UniProtKB/Swiss-Prot annotation:
Matching PROSITE patterns: HTH_LYSR
NAD in keyword set: no
Protein known as: HTH-type transcriptional regulator ArgP
Record family assignment: Belongs to the LysR transcriptional regulatory family.
Record organism: Salmonella arizonae (strain ATCC BAA-731 / CDC346-86 / RSK2980)
The protein's assembly and partners: Homodimer.
């Protein structure tokens, strides 16, 4: 059975995290040649490439498995060493989260853990349809995802759902939808997406108004908070979580353009098994808070 040297695994991890050999060498305080040698040792041990040497480098499928193993070992080391030895160096927890969770419920959920535990968060923002892939690749130790099925050697629990409403400012609605939201009026109304892979708006329009993808003008803005600002200032109509705009809806600053219609995204919490003590704290905090503020039906 092949047992990797975790020092060499850390070199592979550093190349991926630092997006190159030079910065990985600086991070590890060794030469760039030494980084290359350690990775070559690993590749010789497993008889296959572990890195695709692109810019930036990315792990092969076997490399992903080894990085996932390293994440688990690091967390279990924290479990075994105990508070006395780990308290002086905060534990790094890399989590993949969607932008809307980060903008609404995630940080309040983690507040008790951050206040009581010596950890450093590395929150990697990704669409909820793709966060699980980061866990699969070993880039993170936990992920908020819409996928309900656990990966091999992982655990999953239901968090609850975010309900998305189709909203805009009153002046925007008067300009683009004077006779209500119709298929023809939607073709002229500017919308917004998080990135080119974000299909929330398009899926809603296709499902409820039979509009094919790509048929409406759409801005690309990588910020959940900016969606709210764009809607408030009358620039776009948007799909925004109800949880994020409760005050704006109550005050009338934003209006629900399609009462009775919404887009529901059920969220799940994925992480490696077995859980370390610290990850168990994170899990408990996320589930407790998520079950309070997210839809459970």
């Amino acid at each position: 059975m092949k047992r990797p040297d975790y020092r060499t695994l850390q070199a592979l991890d550093a190349v991926i995290r630092e997006r190159g050999f030079e910065r990985a060498a600086q991070k590890l305080c060794i030469t760039q040649s030494a980084v290359s040698q350690r990775i070559k040792q690993l590749e010789n041990m497993f008889g296959q490439p572990l890195l695709v040497r692109t810019v930036p480098p990315r792990p092969t499928e076997q490399g992903q498995k080894l990085l996932a193993l390293l994440r688990q070992v690091e967390l279990l080391e924290e479990e075994w060493l105990g508070d006395e030895q780990t308290g002086s160096t905060p534990l790094l927890l890399s989590l993949a989260v969607n932008a809307d969770s980060l903008a609404t419920w995630l940080l309040p959920a983690l507040a008790p853990v951050l206040a009581d535990s010596p950890i450093r968060l590395n929150l990697q923002v990704e669409d909820e349809t793709r966060t699980q892939e980061r866990l699969r690749r070993g880039e993170v130790v936990g992920a908020v995802s819409i996928q309900h099925q656990a990966l091999p050697s992982c655990l999953v629990d239901k968090l609850g759902a975010l309900d998305y409403l189709f909203v805009a400012s009153k002046p925007f609605a008067e300009r683009y939808f004077p006779n209500g939201v119709t298929r023809s009026s939607l073709l002229k109304a500017p919308a917004v997406a998080f990135d080119h892979l974000d299909d929330m708006h398009q899926a809603f329009l296709q499902q409820n108004f039979d509009l094919p993808p790509g048929s409406v003008p759409c801005h690309i803005v990588n910020s959940s908070e900016a969606f709210v600002q764009l809607a408030r200032q009358g620039t776009t109509c948007c799909m925004i979580p109800h949880l994020q705009i409760e005050q704006e809806l109550e005050s009338g600053e934003l209006i629900n353009l399609t009462p009775g219609l919404l887009q529901r995204r059920m969220l799940y919490w994925h992480r490696f098994a077995p859980e370390s003590r610290m990850m168990r704290k994170v899990t408990d905090a996320l589930l407790e808070y998520g079950h309070k503020v997210l839809r459970q039906d």
